[in-house]
A protein has these predicted regions:
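A short acidic, Gly/Pro-enriched loop at the edge of an enzyme's catalytic core
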Residues: 113-120
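SAM-dependent methyltransferase
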Residues: 155-230
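A short glycine-rich, Lys/Arg-flanked "PGG" loop and its adjoining helix->strand segment in the class I
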Residues: 138-150
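A short His-aromatic
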Residues: 129-131
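Residues lining the SAM
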Residues: 124-126
Length: 234
């Protein structure tokens, strides 16, 4: 991929759509510290609290399908939407192993389409932060509202400006494993609210050598008040 500095703000999501290519192969390995089971327990508890014991649930930004599978295991009829063909490929491998009847759709969150409404929509692991334009985030919220049942609920998480500024900041993280190695360089611009993940991967090849690949990801920090404002507008 090209260097991050050459991209215009309106193209951040397009660059993200090109990412997760080689990283999809090892995404679950390097994300094994995420407590998906606890996340699933929280989501399921919240769904049941609002009377959603079963029915169709949509996951936006489903990635490799880890959470989608956990919700399907709990009896929900799952639809997973993601814009990465490679990530969905990993998700479909999980589906083949589990036998769950999950519908996966390769779609842009800003333009996703369904044939009808759903009981609930969920989005985890800061997927909404990848929507870097305010008007695009409003569009996503409007689509969510359009495809939810009248008594449906929308559950999502987003990274806050505090996390980007104080926790991630301008840091570098490196990890080496048998399955591959990565260098994660993080840079947060407080003025624009844009956070850049520059990810360098070293993945083993069959000939014993390593292949180097670089992926650049952009996220946007939104103030909680702005998120509430956009939700109310939707």
């Amino acid at each position: 991929m090209n260097a991050a500095g050459d991209e215009q703000p309106g193209k951040y999501l397009e660059v993200f759509m090109e990412a997760y290519s080689d990283f999809a192969r090892v995404y679950d390995i390097f994300m094994d510290n995420v407590e998906y089971e606890k996340w699933a327990e929280y989501l399921i508890g919240s769904l049941k609290e609002y009377g959603i014991e079963d029915g169709i649930v949509l996951e936006l930004g489903c990635g490799t399908g880890v959470m989608t599978e956990l919700l399907a295991e709990s009896g929900y009829d799952m639809i997973g939407v993601d814009n990465s063909e490679e990530m969905l490929g990993e998700a479909m491998e999980k589906r083949a192993e589990s036998g769950h009847e999950i519908l996966y759709l390769e779609q842009d969150m800003r333009e996703f389409e369904l044939y009808g409404t759903v009981r609930a929509i969920v989005s985890v692991c800061d997927c909404m932060n990848y929507i870097t334009e305010e008007e695009d985030l409003l569009t996503v919220f409007k689509l969510v509202n359009n495809y939810l049942d009248p008594d449906g609920i929308f559950i999502f998480d987003m990274n806050t400006p505090y996390k980007y500024r104080e926790i991630l900041g301008n840091t570098t993280i490196a990890e080496n494993r048998e399955e591959g190695s990565f260098i994660w360089e993080n840079e947060f611009d407080e003025e624009t609210g844009i956070n850049v993940y520059d990810l360098t991967l070293f993945l083993p090849r069959e000939d014993g050598l390593y292949e180097r690949d670089e992926e650049i990801h952009y996220q946007k920090a939104y103030e909680p008040e702005k998120i509430r404002e956009l939700l109310e507008k939707a």
